């Protein structure tokens, strides 16, 4: 046997290589299966959460909004607007007919989500009609520095504004300014207070 291995050493090397490769493939397959399972579970939790908050906040009252978890309340209101728009044959036309308060809450929903990686991500992902409505909401609800940073990027990303240019250094500066201003700002509480103030538009 030893003599055979000496004579055909390359076969032994090949067998070892195949064994190592097989272990590697099995390990990668297990990791991929784990990721897929985790992603599927996360998606199921997300869908369950969305369904739950839509039902919970299908009907609104000041008492319900004040006593509720503010994130759930905001998400529920925004997701019900989203569900309504999805059912329309022309979403842009339906959005244009919404009360201003609903437009702004819907825009804020996307702003809060898309800006987690930076304010500029919101502008990269969205345009008219969401961005003007987000601007209105930000100017009335957010801290001054956040509103200034938002307005700066709004102008920079506006193709019709010839007085502003998209300069990467300025974008980074505004992203940082916005992030700092929002650190201690209770976004969900401010948004829910806005909904309560304009409750007739949501009922």
Question: Where in this protein do the model-derived segments appear?
Answer:
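Extended, alpha-helix-rich binding/interface surfaces that flank or overlap catalytic cores
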Residues: 31, 52-106, 112, 123, ...
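Boundary/linker elements of alpha-helical solenoid repeat scaffolds
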Residues: 113-118
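N-terminal signal-anchor transmembrane alpha helix of single-pass membrane proteins
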Residues: 1-38
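Short juxtamembrane segments adjacent to a transmembrane helix
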Residues: 30-57
């Amino acid at each position: 046997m030893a003599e055979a291995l000496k004579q055909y050493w390359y076969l032994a090397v090949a067998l070892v290589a195949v064994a190592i490769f097989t272990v590697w493939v099995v390990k990668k397959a297990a990791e991929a299966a784990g990721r897929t399972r985790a992603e599927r579970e996360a998606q199921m939790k997300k869908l369950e959460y969305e369904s739950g908050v839509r039902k919970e906040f299908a009907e609104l009252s000041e008492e319900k909004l004040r006593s509720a978890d503010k994130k759930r309340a905001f998400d529920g209101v925004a997701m019900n607007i989203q569900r309504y728009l999805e059912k329309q044959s022309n979403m842009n036309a339906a959005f244009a007919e919404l009360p201003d308060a609903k437009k702004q809450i819907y825009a804020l929903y996307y702003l809060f989500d898309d800006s987690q990686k930076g304010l500029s991500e919101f502008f990269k992902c969205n345009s008219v009609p969401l961005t003007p409505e987000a601007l209105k909401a930000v100017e009335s609800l957010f801290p001054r520095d956040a509103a200034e940073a938002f307005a700066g990027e709004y102008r920079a990303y506006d193709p019709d504004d010839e007085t502003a240019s998209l300069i990467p250094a300025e974008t980074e500066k505004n992203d940082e300014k916005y992030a700092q201003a929002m650190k201690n700002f209770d976004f969900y509480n401010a948004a829910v207070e806005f909904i309560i103030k304009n409750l007739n538009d949501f009922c």
